[in-house]
């Protein structure tokens, strides 16, 4: 019973960390998948595309600054991996290329990605450390739990940063509004005094 509950928890944690998608890629188009990844995390992926004679699909993985982390041309089926240097939004793009003389056909692309602790080989760790299967499962669950906690801490930190930014922006907007109102009141007062002196000079008012 306890082992069954442990397996359920492991499956839920794996669903949290692993991402499998399948999509259709139209001829001469590209589709990108983007995700925020913490610093110093290993990202691994497997891809497979439906084969259409004469059509080519390339893939490229890069960060928001355009640095290429992984790239391959004319792909059909394979794997890739890269290490995230800093916390950033990383994207993986699949690019379809079809010759001008050929009528393009929509291709299917499947992608499975893993990051962080999901990239570890716990079977190898268990054999090296001579751990029992249940101990390996517990080790996997512990690492996954730590990873989820770190993700929540990072989300909380980013939320606080965004809240601080919003508060600073609101304070600046309020200060600018008060400053604008003071300028308008000052300008209106100056206009009244100027017109009063003008009308007095023209002897239109006492």
Curated annotation (Swiss-Prot):
Keywords: Developmental protein, Membrane, Signal, Transmembrane, Transmembrane helix. It comes from the Eukaryota. Pfam families: EMP24_GP25L. One of its GO terms (cellular component) is membrane. It is found in: Membrane. GO terms for biological process: dorsal/ventral pattern formation; endoplasmic reticulum to Golgi vesicle-mediated transport. One of its GO terms (molecular function) is cargo receptor activity. Residues 1-20 form the signal peptide. The chain crosses the membrane at residues 173-193. It is a single-pass type I membrane protein. Residues 194-206 are cytoplasmic. Residues 21-172 are lumenal. Residues 30-140 form the GOLD domain. Eca and bai are essential, though not redundant, for dorsoventral patterning of the embryo. Specifically required during early embryogenesis for the activity of maternal tkv, while the zygotic tkv is not affected. Belongs to the EMP24/GP25L family. This is Transmembrane emp24 domain-containing protein bai.
């Amino acid at each position: 019973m306890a082992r069954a509950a442990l397996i359920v928890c492991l499956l839920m944690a794996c669903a949290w960390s692993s991402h499998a998608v399948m999509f259709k890629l139209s001829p001469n188009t590209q589709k990108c998948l983007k995700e925020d990844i913490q610093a110093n995390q290993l990202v691994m992926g497997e891809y497979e595309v439906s084969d259409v004679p004469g059509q080519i699909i390339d893939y490229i993985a890069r960060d928001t600054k355009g640095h290429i982390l992984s790239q391959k041309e004319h792909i059909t089926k394979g794997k890739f991996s890269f290490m995230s240097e800093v916390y950033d939004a990383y994207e993986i793009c699949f690019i379809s290329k079809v010759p001008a003389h050929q009528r393009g056909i929509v291709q299917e692309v499947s992608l499975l990605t893993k990051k962080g602790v999901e990239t570890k080989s716990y079977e190898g760790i268990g054999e090296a450390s001579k751990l029992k299967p249940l101990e390996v499962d517990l080790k996997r669950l512990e690492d996954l739990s730590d990873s989820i906690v770190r993700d929540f801490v990072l989300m909380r930190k980013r939320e606080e940063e965004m809240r601080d930014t919003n508060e600073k922006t609101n304070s600046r907007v309020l200060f600018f509004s008060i400053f604008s109102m003071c300028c308008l009141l000052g300008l209106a007062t100056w206009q009244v005094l100027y017109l009063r002196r003008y009308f007095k000079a023209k002897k239109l008012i006492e």
